Amino acid sequence: MKFDVCVPILGFENVKEVTLEKIDDAFMRMESSNDEHISFTLINPFALREYDFEIPDATQKLLEIDEKSNILILNIAIIQTPVEDTVVNFIGPMIFNTDNNKAAQLVLSESTKYGVAEKISLYLKK
């Protein structure tokens, strides 16, 4: 599924369109449509922890989100070996409106309870 990027991905401002591909129930791959060398592994944060935040009105307008919209929230993960060393960026979620194929990265306030590089091992069941 292709998405137009309405709010740039930090550090990748030239990425204007991405393709989202399911890997499994928790992970997805997001790749730049213009540059196959730019790709990210994304994770469903709700598979790991409680995760909630408000999407600002300005972002809702850009993505044309309303109360009926189907949205997908994913976070960038840096996969490591062993997998327990993988880190997740909970402070910069990707928001996808699957109704109109628009996407944005949202940067949460630094006062949030979420981190930029939290080890996945903190949330894996032992």
From Swiss-Prot:
Domain of life, source organism: Bacteria
How the protein assembles, per its UniProt entry? Answer: Interacts with translational regulator CsrA and flagellin(s).
Question: Can you name this protein?
Answer: Flagellar assembly factor FliW
Gene Ontology biological-process entries: bacterial-type flagellum assembly; regulation of translation
Task: List the subcellular locations.
Answer: Cytoplasm
Q: Which keywords describe this protein according to UniProt?
A: Bacterial flagellum biogenesis, Chaperone, Cytoplasm, Translation regulation
Record carries keyword Ligase: no
InterPro entries, per the entry: Flagellar_assembly_factor_FliW, Flagellar_assmbl_FliW_dom_sf
Specify whether Coiled coil is a keyword of the entry. Answer: no
